[in-house]
Amino acid sequence: MTLPPLSHLDRLEAESIHILREVAAEFRAPVMLYSVGKDSSVLLHLLLKAFAPSPPPIPLLHVDTRWKFREMIAFRDRRAAETAVDLRVHINPEGVAQDIGPISHGAAVHTDVMKTQGLKQALEQGGFDAAIGGARRDEEKSRAKERVFSFRNARHRWDPKNQRPELWNLYNARTKPGESVRVFPLSNWTELDIWLYIYRERIPVVPLYFAAPRPVVQRDGAWIMVDDDRLPLHPGETPQLRSVRFRTLGCYPLTGAIESTADTLEAVIAEMLVSTSSERQGRMIDHAPGASMEQKKLEGYF
């Protein structure tokens, strides 16, 4: 009997499911980082598929900065209830005590304390030896050269000059005491692949990815959504109601929207087919001096 050939998305799906099962088999205490974005939504869907009909043996971890869009938090809690996954939420208590935020302390300090340090705290407290994430190689140049199994030392630091070879679909999961591994099952996916898979599988995503009239102000060439009253307005600044959507989601004062009328999956995919800009163009932290993705990863960022 001749089996029909696998489609491009079928091959990507099979590869990702293989990686997830490999992690479950090789590591003592793996965890999946759930940032609530489109890549995390795809990763959660794959995790559920990989171990169906049983519940996934890998818990989810969300490192909450207290500055995520309100729709993201509502979506996170709703999906956790719908899928009955083991979702754990960590907020850096030291950051809370100092009331660290992107406006009061700046983007670099906020990202380091609430994201990087918060992530390291959560991994250490949970005793996790592998953390699965939804990063893709097409997102950013430092991620383009990272392995699927990315090894970190006892301080969670990444050494891009000291990576293990990965031959075909063979992964080396051995670690020394104190070391851990970041695993990226979506490494070979593109942004368009993600949206095509979401469309094919009908995966729920945060409504912020779809265009709608939203209150925004323009700062440094980016449309920043006024999500709550913590965002101080500049003198003479008045929020405008514009049809915008987000290609990437993070802390709302640091995430720029794009003007768009794409309010359906089909329209988003059509927009993606003609886009010539990076999806991370709206991440304000990427443009800060000395805040390159590689530098953040060297310090323990995901």
Swiss-Prot record:
<dbReference type="InterPro" id="IPR011784">
    <property type="entry name" value="SO4_adenylTrfase_ssu"/>
</dbReference>
<comment type="function">
    <text>With CysN forms the ATP sulfurylase (ATPS) that catalyzes the adenylation of sulfate producing adenosine 5'-phosphosulfate (APS) and diphosphate, the first enzymatic step in sulfur assimilation pathway. APS synthesis involves the formation of a high-energy phosphoric-sulfuric acid anhydride bond driven by GTP hydrolysis by CysN coupled to ATP hydrolysis by CysD.</text>
</comment>
<dbReference type="InterPro" id="IPR014729">
    <property type="entry name" value="Rossmann-like_a/b/a_fold"/>
</dbReference>
<dbReference type="InterPro" id="IPR002500">
    <property type="entry name" value="PAPS_reduct_dom"/>
</dbReference>
<dbReference type="InterPro" id="IPR050128">
    <property type="entry name" value="Sulfate_adenylyltrnsfr_sub2"/>
</dbReference>
<dbReference type="GO" id="GO:0070814">
    <property type="term" value="P:hydrogen sulfide biosynthetic process"/>
</dbReference>
<comment type="similarity">
    <text>Belongs to the PAPS reductase family. CysD subfamily.</text>
</comment>
<dbReference type="GO" id="GO:0000103">
    <property type="term" value="P:sulfate assimilation"/>
</dbReference>
<keyword id="KW-0067">ATP-binding</keyword>
<keyword id="KW-0547">Nucleotide-binding</keyword>
<comment type="pathway">
    <text>Sulfur metabolism; hydrogen sulfide biosynthesis; sulfite from sulfate: step 1/3.</text>
</comment>
<dbReference type="GO" id="GO:0004781">
    <property type="term" value="F:sulfate adenylyltransferase (ATP) activity"/>
</dbReference>
<keyword id="KW-0808">Transferase</keyword>
<dbReference type="GO" id="GO:0005524">
    <property type="term" value="F:ATP binding"/>
</dbReference>
<protein>
    <recommendedName>
        <fullName>Sulfate adenylyltransferase subunit 2</fullName>
        <ecNumber>2.7.7.4</ecNumber>
    </recommendedName>
</protein>
<comment type="subunit">
    <text>Heterodimer composed of CysD, the smaller subunit, and CysN.</text>
</comment>
<keyword id="KW-0548">Nucleotidyltransferase</keyword>
<dbReference type="Pfam" id="PF01507">
    <property type="entry name" value="PAPS_reduct"/>
</dbReference>
